[in-house]
């Protein structure tokens, strides 16, 4: 299977080099596509190349197996951290951070959404970093994939292989809803279909991704708002933002930045602490975003 991926890559590269002018036109098409889909990073079309990264079914299985193993280890480390004073000492987090980490999210699996950065070469997989607190990029990759689906149609040589794509937006939504369903099982007054709030600071470089997610969530029937942590209030035992009741928070704001602006976000944090909304990811995932975890796990 690895050899087959090599053949796909080589065939595609040969096609690109056969007609550089045509390839340049396809790249311009891809950039226009990203612009039309509002797939922006720092107000520019999301940076990419005309060369997608193909992986085989066997490589996919390797990735899935490794990610499951690492995710399980990271979840166990979070649990260990909460119970072991020596591990807490080694990690060196502050009392304020530890207070956030101790908040019960209302569901059992802390790593709802993660991005584990890695290189894969044939059968070898090397992880560089664990983005567990507020990972970005899933929705960008979906829009880029949609663009590539159009580009690859113009290179018939690829018809020899079946190219599959991932629906990342649906995967994000499913992960959020799985956590919400577990949270709601203990709070039956919460609605079956939550209002979702995507929360980060105003003007962040990844703001366009929130619009992509909002559009997708609403097409699936979930009312969604994009708001800032300073906008939250507590009314009648519920969290509200911009006058809307919020049941499920997709927390994109980085925990470290919340701590730097605690005086602005006291209500936001208090509402999460009191379990007035289901929040993903929980603050405790910040524990395993620290590079010290790589050393301790190995």
Predicted regions and their residues:
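Preference for protein termini
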Residues: 1-298
């Amino acid at each position: 299977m690895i050899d087959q991926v090599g053949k796909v890559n080589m065939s595609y590269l040969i096609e690109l080099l056969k007609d550089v002018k045509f390839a340049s036109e396809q790249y311009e098409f891809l950039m226009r596509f990203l612009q039309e889909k509002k797939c922006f990073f720092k107000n520019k079309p999301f940076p990419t190349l005309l060369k997608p990264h193909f992986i085989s079914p066997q490589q996919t299985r390797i990735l899935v197996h490794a990610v499951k193993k690492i995710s399980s280890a990271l979840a166990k480390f979070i649990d260990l951290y909460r119970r072991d004073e020596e591990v807490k000492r080694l990690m060196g987090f502050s009392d304020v951070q530890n207070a956030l980490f101790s908040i019960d999210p209302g569901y059992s699996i802390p790593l709802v959404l993660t991005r584990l950065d890695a290189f894969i070469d044939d059968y070898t997989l090397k992880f560089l970093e664990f983005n567990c607190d507020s990972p970005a990029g899933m929705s960008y990759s979906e829009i880029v994939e949609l663009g590539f689906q159009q580009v690859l149609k113009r290179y018939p040589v690829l018809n020899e292989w079946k190219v599959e794509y991932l629906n990342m937006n649906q995967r994000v939504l499913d992960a959020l809803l799985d956590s919400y369903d577990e949270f709601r099982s203990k709070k039956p007054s919460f609605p079956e279909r939550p209002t979702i709030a995507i929360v980060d600071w105003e003007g962040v470089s990844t703001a366009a991704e929130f619009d992509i997610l909002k559009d997708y969530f609403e097409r699936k029937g979930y009312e969604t708002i994009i708001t800032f942590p300073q906008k939250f209030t507590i009314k009648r035992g519920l969290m509200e933002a911009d006058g809307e009741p919020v049941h499920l928070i997709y927390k994109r704001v980085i925990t470290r930045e919340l701590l730097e602006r605690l005086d602005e976000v006291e209500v936001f944090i208090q509402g999460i602490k009191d379990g007035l909304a289901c929040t993903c990811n929980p603050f405790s995932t910040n524990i395993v975003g620290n590079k010290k975890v790589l050393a301790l796990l190995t």
